[in-house]
Design a protein with these regions (language model features):
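P-loop (Walker A) phosphate-binding loop of NTP-binding proteins
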Residues: 17
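ATP-binding Walker
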Residues: 20
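Walker A/P-loop
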Residues: 23
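Small-molecule kinase domains that catalyze NTP-dependent phosphoryl transfer to phosphate-bearing small molecules
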Residues: 123-162, 168
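Hydrophobic anchor at the beta1->P-loop junction of P-loop NTPases
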Residues: 14
Length: 168
């Protein structure tokens, strides 16, 4: 096997705080590429009431791993995965360790913005929960490309990520 060959399949992870724009950006990226798939981590654990302290929350990781495995094993060239929990190194590693596909590359992106921008986006979304800056101040996972979304349109952020994905 040629060890210098970069796998054709790319798993693109979009992490960041709630309301930073992960889903919106990932949806746009997904439609910009042929033979692509998109999975939003929010779909993996949609429960009421939701609590970050719920010990069952990590069960959603298995759903994420399964969905990503299914897309990669179905030979999609690009798989886009957006999730707030992918901001945590240990959680991301646990999800990726359970992916059953082989020979794919992983590109990680962390979207960020100012507290003021996050608050404006939170209000615009109409979220009734209190806006938290906790995730905004987490250090990005090692190796992630950090994209500051302040004063950028969704398309500008998509184009910035697309340049990196296309060069990889």
């Amino acid at each position: 096997m040629d060890m210098t060959r970069i796998p054709k399949q790319k798993l693109v992870i979009i992490a960041g705080s709630p309301c930073v724009g992960k889903t919106t950006v990932a949806e746009k990226l997904f439609t910009a590429y042929e033979n692509s798939a998109f999975f939003d981590g929010d779909w993996a654990w949609r429960v009421n009431p939701f609590s970050i302290n719920d010990p069952r929350l990590r069960n959603g990781n298995k759903t994420m791993s399964y969905a990503l495995s299914t897309y990669l094993n179905s030979c999609f060239d690009y798989v886009f995965f957006s999730s707030v929990v992918a901001a945590y190194k240990e959680t991301r590693e646990a999800i990726l360790n359970d992916v059953t596909a082989n020979e794919y590359s992983v590109l990680g992106f962390t979207l960020t913005c100012s507290e003021d921008t996050l608050l404006k986006r939170h209000k615009k979304r109409g979220d009734k929960n209190e806006c938290s800056f906790f995730w905004l101040h987490l250090a990005p996972c090692e190796g992630d490309y950090v994209i500051n979304t302040d004063n950028k349109s969704v398309q500008q952020v998509v184009d910035e990520i697309k340049c990196i994905v296309d060069e990889y």
